[in-house]
A protein has these predicted regions:
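Short, charged, low-complexity patches
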Residues: 69-77, 81
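Short, glycine/acidic-rich hinge or "gate" loops at secondary-structure transitions
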Residues: 90-105
Length: 263
């Protein structure tokens, strides 16, 4: 849930076209005689959020419910919440935009792509191509990659001067944090991004982005519903929320793809 916690969250009416400027405002210098132009400026780009339902449902027999009601109730909500957050995080990157949020990898507005050969992937010079693509205004972003990609390919990498650029930091509480080329790294599971070893040619193996440039819109916060299905002697529980998500600003997002060995 670390990625879901970092993306921007709003609550606006679905179906309404929202100018990007409203989601990513800019400040302007003014004088006593001249007010800011934003009063008459119009944004060329906009996003529209839809109504997509996400639910996690489970049932148990009435007999089992009598025996384990409190235990089941205590477990269901956190388990359902975890499952729904995981589904949203997968959609943030791989969502098709049809019946679910539009993911970063599927958004045609994300055009910055760097392809690394195996030799480049394993070297500072190769990843320096990615750093050179980072725009100044967006350099406070983070890398997103598979845990295996970081552990086997990035951790311990050195620059041309022998200085480590990929490393694992261990906090006083034992929690691991990852850094690469001066940027934070968020590691994900295989269902979000494949590892370098498992990826096919042309697959995205890493993303550089500022998480606040992706917006999650909820029209109905997570609700828990419980009812009895007397025909089947089942007690049913479900968590339900209405959510959509889209990239608000694609200018700072970079996709890193797997290439083939240069000949």
């Amino acid at each position: 849930g670390s990625i879901y916690a970092k993306v921007r969250k709003i609550n606006v009416q679905g179906g309404v076209s929202i100018p990007i400027a409203d989601l990513k405002p800019t400040a302007h210098w003014i004088t006593e005689a001249k007010s800011s132009d934003d009063q008459k400026a119009s944004a060329k780009n906009s996003v529209t959020f839809n109504y997509y339902g996400l639910e996690c449902k489970i049932s148990q027999s009435i007999l089992a419910n009598v025996v384990t009601l409190k235990m089941f109730t205590d477990l269901f909500v956190p388990m359902a919440t975890e499952a729904m957050v995981k589904a949203i995080e997968i959609a943030i990157f791989n969502g098709t935009g049809e019946g679910q949020p539009l993911g970063v990898l599927k958004d045609s507005r994300v055009t910055a792509v760097i392809t690394l050969t195996p030799e480049e992937y394993a070297s500072w010079n190769g990843w320096h191509k990615v750093k050179g693509k980072m725009k100044k205004a967006y350099r406070n972003g983070s890398f997103v990659m598979n845990q295996s990609t970081f552990d086997t390919g990035i951790d311990g990498m050195e620059d041309k001067n022998g200085q480590p650029i990929g490393r694992t930091n261990y906090g006083v509480n034992g929690e691991e944090t990852y850094r690469f080329m001066g940027k934070n790294v968020e590691t994900v599971e295989d269902d979000v991004l494949p590892s370098w070893d498992d990826a096919n040619e042309g697959d995205v193996i890493a993303v550089f982005m500022n998480f606040s440039d992706y917006v999650i819109n909820t029209n109905m916060e997570m609700q828990v519903v419980k009812w009895t299905d007397h025909d089947n002697n089942k007690i049913k529980n479900k968590c339900l929320m209405v959510v959509d998500g889209k990239v608000a600003d694609a200018a700072g997002i970079i996709l890193v793809k797997k290439g083939v060995t240069a000949v």
